[in-house]
Amino acid sequence: MKIPLAVILGPTGTGKTKLSLELAKYLPVEIVSVDSMQIYQGMDIGTAKPSLEDREKVPHHLIDIVLPDYFFTVAEFRERALKVIEEIYARRRFPLLVGGTPLYYKVLFGEFSIPHVPPDLEFRRKMKELAEKEGEYKLYEELKKIDPKTASKIHPRDLKRIIRALEVYYKVGKPISELAGEKKEDRFYISKIGLYMPRDLHYRILEERVDKMIEQGLVDEVRNLYLKGINENFVSMQGIGYKEILRYLRGELTLEESINLIKKRTKEFVKRQYTWFKKYKDIHWFDVSQYSLSQLAKLVYNTIINDWENQGYKYQNREGVNYFND
């Protein structure tokens, strides 16, 4: 059975959450978060989670599902997301995937499989110590020797992914590129919606977004996590905003320096998101600065329905209550 679903993706700060809630007025949907940071409990401000009020209006999934000290793998995301998608459709509603974590989309839609190798915390600690002593490029060069294909897809300074690739190799004796071979699947009718805006406007919104997070209490949020033992050794604390505020709390940066660093890294991250998403040719891109929210929701609604119908899904009654192929 093929399941019709829609995706709202795009870089941080483009209004994905607002659009998803507005779209819910036109389609009977439940929202599946595709965000690698919103999975963590107690990390609300820095991850820009939908409010509890919004989550009561429209059911949301894969938010607040693990504690910040838990190492959540991409393989786990795929397993949980597929289960949730099937459950949503069984309730006669449509899954609406919303978020900006490119790797999650890639593994969910079967572009490659991820080996389910449990994390080795001791191995990671040793690798981080080696990187601190001899530099990140030392580990990157090692990865290039054992798995050049994977290395070519990872930035030389992306220490987390470099260590993970090395970890998989030393655990199972095979490079991750060999284990994660292409495995395309055809289990969904998919409509992909991408959001963007002019760069100057986007950067201004990103800066305002960071300032708002500080006003909402991001410093206290990070302080509470740190007091519970959550530090930079945990994946959850690698999110932009958290590690910079942690440095402020330790006296390594002033608050102004940490805020400026958050803004700088957020803009850099957005550039990488654009680069990744632009590789895909089957995304319908919308400049959000050109429409009101209601106008955009109507355009996106029609685009989704047309995509589904072009792929063979019979969307029966746009005005009625029966949207399913009964």
From Swiss-Prot:
E.C. no: 2.5.1.75
Domain of life: Bacteria
Record's keyword annotation contains Transcription regulation: no
Site feature: Interaction with substrate tRNA: 101, 124
InterPro entries reported in the protein's UniProt record: Dimethylallyltransferase, IPT, P-loop_NTPase
Cofactors demanded by this protein: Mg(2+)
Class of enzymatic activity (EC top level): transferase
SUPFAM superfamilies according to UniProt: P-loop containing nucleoside triphosphate hydrolases
GO biological process: tRNA modification
UniProt binding sites for substrate: 12-17
Catalytic activity annotation: adenosine(37) in tRNA + dimethylallyl diphosphate = N(6)-dimethylallyladenosine(37) in tRNA + diphosphate
A Pfam family assignment: IPPT
Coiled-coil ranges per UniProt: none
Positions bound to ATP: 10-17
Region feature (Interaction with substrate tRNA): 35-38
Keywords attached to this entry: ATP-binding, Magnesium, Nucleotide-binding, Transferase, tRNA processing
NCBIfam families to which the protein is assigned, alphabetical: miaA
Function per UniProt: Catalyzes the transfer of a dimethylallyl group onto the adenine at position 37 in tRNAs that read codons beginning with uridine, leading to the formation of N6-(dimethylallyl)adenosine (i(6)A).
Subunit structure: Monomer.
Protein name: tRNA dimethylallyltransferase
Organism expressing this protein natively: Dictyoglomus turgidum (strain DSM 6724 / Z-1310)
